[in-house]
């Protein structure tokens, strides 16, 4: 989003394949990073590695561009501490900025394109998480996730004159550094109906709406390659500002038959109204977004190792 970049999905790969649901449901085999309370259903040590790839297409009436990229999705280790307590530690990308745009202009009507305007953004924010899930009694679950967010995002605007024989690139740099903690709480309720049939209810809420950040602005002159700096001048020394964050609340309901099937529905609401731009100043108020997800899973024979569809 504005400032810290495009957000990565909060759901792990196993939940993405089910439309992102996971607020109320967990099979106890894969680690649930959507609702920390449901970690208490994991009674085995689990280590997960996820990767993410994407293909983007940018197109207008004159030209078309495709961008392909990828990144690690998550590294997570889940450890049962006791029969009622499970902890998890992991690292995953939180957001990223990655774009490069150029435009060309002639200095006169008869000349060739000799001015190059460049707009570039690079950087990312990483999330290091430590979560705990507790089972209270037989039917209630509570969880808390603590995250440390850190990273840098650099946005540059440049002008390069190709007609003077020097080819110097004049660049205005805006470097933002992020470092702070965030928290998320979760709860779940699991009620037995009959014959291994359960109804599950869950909820999560972000407890942090802002984080600390610093910004440095400087003016630089680069050579033709754009790699070597000839001269630089700090326009404004590093100063602190507060980056407002979107706050998400999730609710989930699911019906589950152990080791057989599960159907569920999740609702999430994200408040973007206080999110500001990368300069720490308010922009036009953004709306509140909502999302509904309905999906499920079916296992023909949970104990089969020779044929998945048995």
Label each residue range with its predicted role:
Residues 1-95:
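N-terminal, post-signal peptide beta-strand-biased segments of exported outer-membrane/organellar beta-barrel
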């Amino acid at each position: 989003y504005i400032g810290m970049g495009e957000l990565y999905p909060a759901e792990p790969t196993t939940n993405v394949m089910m439309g992102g649901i996971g607020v109320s449901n967990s099979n106890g085999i894969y680690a649930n990073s959507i609702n920390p309370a449901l970690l208490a259903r994991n009674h085995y040590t689990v280590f997960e590695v996820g990767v993410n790839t994407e293909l983007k297409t940018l197109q207008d009436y004159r030209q078309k561009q495709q961008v392909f990229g990828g990144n690690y999705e998550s590294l997570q280790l889940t450890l049962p501490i006791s029969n009622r307590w499970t902890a998890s530690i992991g690292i995953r990308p939180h957001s990223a900025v990655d774009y490069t745009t150029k435009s060309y202009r002639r200095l006169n009507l008869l000349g060739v394109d000799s001015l190059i305007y460049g707009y570039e953004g690079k950087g990312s924010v990483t999330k290091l998480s430590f979560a705990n899930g507790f089972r209270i009694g037989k039917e209630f679950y509570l969880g808390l996730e603590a995250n440390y967010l850190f990273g840098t995002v650099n946005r540059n605007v440049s002008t390069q004159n190709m007609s003077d024989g020097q080819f110097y690139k004049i660049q205005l740099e805006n470097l933002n550094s992020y470092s702070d903690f965030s928290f998320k709480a979760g709860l779940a309720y699991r009620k037995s109906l009959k014959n291994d049939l359960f109804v599950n209810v869950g909820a999560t809420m972000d407890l942090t709406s802002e984080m600390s950040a610093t910004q440095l602005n400087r003016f630089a002159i680069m050579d033709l390659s754009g790699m070597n700096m000839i001269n630089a001048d700090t326009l404004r020394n590093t100063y602190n500002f507060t980056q407002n964050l979107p706050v998400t609340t999730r609710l989930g309901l699911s019906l589950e038959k152990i080791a057989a099937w599960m159907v569920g529905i999740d609702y999430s609401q994200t408040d973007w109204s206080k999110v500001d731009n990368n300069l720490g100043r308010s922009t036009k108020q953004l709306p509140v977004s909502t999302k509904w997800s309905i999906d499920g899973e079916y296992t023909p024979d949970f104990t089969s190792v020779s044929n998945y569809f048995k």
